[in-house]
């Protein structure tokens, strides 16, 4: 089997629970609980929500079986429209990125269907009938979970909606109550959802089945450092001994770092902070209102201090295991050198700090300034425990903020400014060059 033009690896190894409890294909997919979204998918209109179905039942529901079948045969899935639109416009999509990031899993799926088809072609009809029923059933539970325990957030970003920001949701609800016309055009943005769906013992018992399989966990919000559900979940993983086998990824707006957050994530194998910083100075403050640029810079420095301090505490803890009466200066130095060598070889938690600006019509003209600031900060804060990168994201919505809507003069200006990016930034940020090339195409 050769993967089709609509194939995405996620339905074979990834499951997402949105802030309102909806079980979705991924973070940019449409919400399956919306009616009439599935075209000819078999489970049209069927709710996919943790209040109405278990995670494991959702994993191999009629909907998921149909999605896998369509993707394997090259048919489009209605809920994947954002990726198709990006690809039509010549931009990178989550589908393409997922297939690239998980290329080994893609090969495994290809191999599965090759073996299946070979066996199917030589089987008798009764066997074929049984095989037809199980062809797109995935027995293994997903190794990648994206869970969002509510929408608590301290910002009201320009591109966001109430489902991901409690403050913005409250503001939109207030506006819609005063203006019926606004409610008509922004119904989903102003709607109040149930964000306490995880306060349910059945859900936690169901999630327990997944934990031995999970290798990657993506948590955001809202702002993940504020969401209590994240702390509850992570502490449970630590107490049950799963943390050492799991890599964590967080999106954070860099406005709120707490010591307990660093203390918690330090138990996990690898931790990636996706730093949602969209510009320098006023650009950042305008897009991610009401953040303050000075505070963002200070918090970045605090984050580095806390990461380094955590590693120093580990080294001290390592030394204190030895009886002080037998620990002379020479022996202590030898032990420190040994532990430092281990740290340099990825002993303990490894941190990855990734600048993830959302590129849109507002900040595309100052993208070079953000890259150069990020490069300089990274250079000034080198650490053997931290890997730096920049992975910009093309805006997924709302469409009117897409840089494609910029006029010719502004596009020309933004294209010219890309030449100001520090050349060494492309060496440090290995993901930057392909993205800038795509930007140039989009702006031309």
Report residues per predicted region.
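Accessory C-terminal segments flanking Radical SAM cores
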Residues: 1-120, 141, 392-444
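Conserved C-terminal portion of the radical SAM core fold
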Residues: 14-25, 249, 268-274, 294-444
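Glycine-centered loop/turn positions within well-structured domains
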Residues: 24, 155, 282
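Non-catalytic membrane-proximal stalk/linker segments that position and tether the catalytic domains
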Residues: 78-140, 173-203, 209
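C-type cytochrome heme c attachment motif
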Residues: 81-82, 155-159
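Detector for the c-type heme attachment site
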Residues: 84-86, 160-166
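Core AdoMet radical
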Residues: 140-152, 163-199, 212-228, 240-259, ...
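Distinct, well-ordered alpha-helical segments
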Residues: 231-235, 258-265, 366-370
């Amino acid at each position: 089997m050769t993967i089709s033009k609509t194939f995405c690896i996620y339905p074979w190894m990834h499951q997402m629970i949105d802030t309102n409890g909806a079980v979705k294909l991924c973070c940019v997919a449409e919400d399956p609980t919306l009616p009439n979204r599935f075209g000819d998918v078999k489970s049209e209109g069927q709710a996919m929500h943790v209040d109405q179905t278990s995670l494991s039942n959702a994993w191999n529901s009629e909907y998921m079986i149909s999605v896998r079948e369509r993707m394997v045969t090259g048919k489009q899935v209605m809920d994947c429209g954002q990726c198709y639109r990006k690809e039509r416009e010549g931009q990178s999509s989550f589908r393409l990125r997922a297939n690239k990031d998980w290329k080994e899993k893609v090969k495994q799926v290809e191999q599965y269907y090759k073996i299946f088809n070979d066996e199917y072609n030589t089987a008798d009809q009764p066997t074929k009938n049984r095989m037809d029923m199980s062809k797109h059933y995935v027995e293994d539970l997903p190794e990648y979970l994206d869970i969002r325990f509510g929408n608590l957030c301290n910002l009201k970003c320009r591109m966001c909606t109430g489902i991901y920001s409690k403050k913005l949701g409250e503001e939109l609800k207030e506006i819609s109550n005063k203006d019926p016309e606004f409610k008509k055009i922004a119904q989903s943005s102003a709607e109040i959802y149930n964000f306490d769906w995880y306060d349910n013992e059945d859900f936690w018992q169901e999630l327990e089945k997944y934990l031995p399989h999970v290798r990657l966990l993506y948590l955001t919000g809202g702002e993940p450092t504020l969401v209590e559900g994240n702390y509850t979940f992570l502490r449970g993983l630590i107490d049950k001994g799963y943390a050492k086998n799991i890599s964590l990824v967080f999106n954070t707006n860099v406005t709120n770092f707490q010591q307990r957050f660093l203390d918690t994530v330090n138990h996990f194998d690898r931790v990636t902070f996706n730093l949602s910083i969209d510009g320098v100075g006023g650009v950042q403050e305008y897009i991610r209102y009401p953040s303050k640029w000075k505070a963002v810079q200070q918090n970045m420095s605090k984050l580095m201090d806390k990461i380094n301090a955590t590693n120093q505490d580990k080294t001290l803890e390592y030394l204190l295991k030895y009886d002080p009466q037998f620990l002379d200066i020479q022996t202590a130095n030898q032990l420190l050198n040994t532990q430092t060598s281990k740290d340099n070889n990825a002993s303990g938690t490894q941190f990855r700090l990734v600048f993830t600006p959302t590129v849109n019509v507002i900040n595309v003209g100052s993208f070079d300034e953000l890259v150069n600031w990020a490069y300089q900060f990274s250079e000034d804060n080198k650490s053997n425990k931290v890997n730096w990168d920049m992975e910009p994201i093309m805006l997924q919505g709302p469409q009117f903020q897409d840089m494609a809507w910029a006029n010719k003069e502004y596009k020309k200006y933004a294209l010219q400014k890309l030449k100001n990016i520090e050349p060494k930034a492309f060496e440090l940020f290995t993901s930057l060059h392909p993205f800038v090339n795509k930007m140039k195409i989009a702006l031309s």
